[in-house]
Amino acid sequence: MRYLPLTPDDRAAMLGAIGASSIDELFADVPAGARLDGPIAGLPMHASELAVERHMGALARRNRAAGDGPFFLGAGAYRHHVPASVDHLIQRGEFLTAYTPYQPEIAQGTLQMLFEFQSQVARLFGTDVANASMYDGSTACWEAIVMARRITRRSKALLSTGLHPHYRSVARTMAKYTRDVLVDGDPRLEPGTDWAALAGRIDTETSCVVVQYPDILGRIDDMTTLAEACQTAGALLIAVVTEPVALGLIKSPGEMGADIVVGEGQSLGVGLQFGGPYVGLFACKSKYVRQMPGRLCGETVDANGKRGFVLTLSTREQHIRREKATSNICTNSGLCALAFSIHMTLLGEAGLRQLATINHGRAKAAATELAKVPAVSVMNDSFFNEFTLLLPTAARPVVHRLAEQDILGGVSLGRLYPDTAALENGLVVAVTETVTEADIAAFAAALKEVLA
């Protein structure tokens, strides 16, 4: 469709219909100081396409790409290899949208994809059912807390100190406008989790306990005892998974009794992308399905007996009365969910296990080498592909000095917890299949030099 601008006669007719003499009269209520009068200051003149490409290329070169050198950043967003076939397939015109498949008769491909995505997430998390994706991991975590309140009719949520601080921040922001009371704190630099202590703090006002698995420091623990404590007290256990590749090796939260499992799916099929868009994962026990936010795609049979897919549950405020809705999620992360599903399909169960094994093996090798650096130790007694180093000095300046040598050597806890001095010597290091032996050796040598 061509854009045909209004003619002077069109404008005059419209102004006459509303009794205005000029377009400026429409903005009479806007203070003069807030109105734009003339060109925008500092905005360059238009340029040719080639000139714009060169300019944008020059700006892009000021950034450092993840693949330009040794890369050990993690803490919730991980650099994994994404097969070229993933991006190729999601760019097909039939799929290249994140929009809701409102009309099943013309959206069978999208609906089937979401159905398969749900099946994969439920199996990965060890739960009965999963929805068609959320915006990202942090918002999925908050939706789980709200869901627990609806189910238990209680308002206090206990957050593990090992929960990612960004997830805690999102929850605190949202809790300002709800009845939820959040109880949390900063982690301690010690091998074990705080899950045993959490179990002792559950009371009759507790709606849920939220733990991360593996947690922000890379620690892994068995949540079976905590799940039993929650069940005894009538609270729900929410498990947050920020690195789903780990579930190729370690036991799923659902197997250990978690009632709701949420997470971030970025590790599979989705690049780092400057922090987004990502894809939130949400799964739960079947008895809670009607309180689950978002949409649920189901399989059915049409009037002719043919297999088909539909939106089975969609308890969002656009579809039902607002006061009855479980969420207000609109267009969600459908395209990223497709990328996740394609990558999972390409891997298969054996491939995911192999990928997880490679990640863990390289992380063990890195931890061994880095622990040889004088005055450096590995805090964790268990980890998957991420662990915390204890340095003899504040980690944040060390990270900057490593970057000067083109090594992105992890995320300092001083950056994640700027107001907690007790954590400033901690450095969270992630090691995926993209890290080589040469990368590990370079990191260890550079760290030794920086700390000398």
Curated annotation (Swiss-Prot):
It catalyses: N(6)-[(R)-lipoyl]-L-lysyl-[glycine-cleavage complex H protein] + glycine + H(+) = N(6)-[(R)-S(8)-aminomethyldihydrolipoyl]-L-lysyl-[glycine-cleavage complex H protein] + CO2. GO terms for molecular function: glycine dehydrogenase (decarboxylating) activity. GO terms for biological process: glycine decarboxylation via glycine cleavage system; nucleoside metabolic process. Keywords: Oxidoreductase. Its EC number is 1.4.4.2. It comes from the Bacteria. SUPFAM superfamilies: PLP-dependent transferases. It is an enzyme of class 1 (oxidoreductase). Belongs to the GcvP family. N-terminal subunit subfamily. The glycine cleavage system is composed of four proteins: P, T, L and H. In this organism, the P 'protein' is a heterodimer of two subunits. HAMAP family: GcvPA. The glycine cleavage system catalyzes the degradation of glycine. The P protein binds the alpha-amino group of glycine through its pyridoxal phosphate cofactor; CO(2) is released and the remaining methylamine moiety is then transferred to the lipoamide cofactor of the H protein. This is Probable glycine dehydrogenase (decarboxylating) subunit 1. It comes from Sphingopyxis alaskensis (strain DSM 13593 / LMG 18877 / RB2256) (Sphingomonas alaskensis).
